[in-house]
Amino acid sequence: LNNEQLDYSSAAAVEVHDRGLALFRGKAGCISCHGETALGDGNVSNYDKWTEQLVDAKGRTEEDRLEPYRTSFQKYGALLPRPIRPRNLRQGVYRGGRRPIDLYHRISQGINGTPMPNQEQTLTAEEIWSLVFYVRSLPFEHASRPAGVRNLDRERPN
């Protein structure tokens, strides 16, 4: 399966899209960072891999973990570490390019130094292409409320 050879209006495209959605929410584990609706609102407390090793391993509060930076590095002008925000996939802007092959490489190889894992050992090539197809469809879909989420919007009085 090559994403560029697929007729987007065909029944096969619907099947590939649905397979990609199932992988996104399941086996690939994308929702843990990118969120249920791929808005980048999943886990937002990850740091880059280098900082994560320095500040995250001992179960301390974030305030405690950042104390060494405040007391030693900051006086020399170093900035405090900041969490890496997962990409909002609905915007259609991706690190490393938006061509199908670019997304395939991002998913299969991951992004070095970030929490974005490689999926090469987890997913087959066909599964990665299904995921690419699904991710490329996201900017054109309405971001809907995930199933099971309560509607907390209140009606306004007239």
Residue ranges and their predicted role:
Residues 1-26, 39, 145-151:
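Electrostatic cytochrome c docking/interface patches
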Residues 1-2, 100-158:
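C-terminal capping alpha-helices of c-type cytochrome domains
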Residues 1-14, 83-92, 110-112:
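Short glycine/proline-rich turn/loop motifs
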Residues 10, 14, 27, 97, ...:
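Short, solvent-exposed loop/helix junctions and linker helices
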Residues 12-36, 43-61, 131:
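Sequence/structural segment immediately N-terminal to covalent heme-attachment motifs in c-type
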Residues 16-19, 88, 115-118:
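Conserved beta-strand positions that form and line the central face of beta-propeller blades
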Residues 35-37, 41-48, 117-119, 143-148:
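Short, solvent-exposed loop/turn and secondary-structure capping segments
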Residues 37-100:
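Gly/Gly-Pro-rich "capping" loops immediately C-terminal to redox-active cysteine motifs
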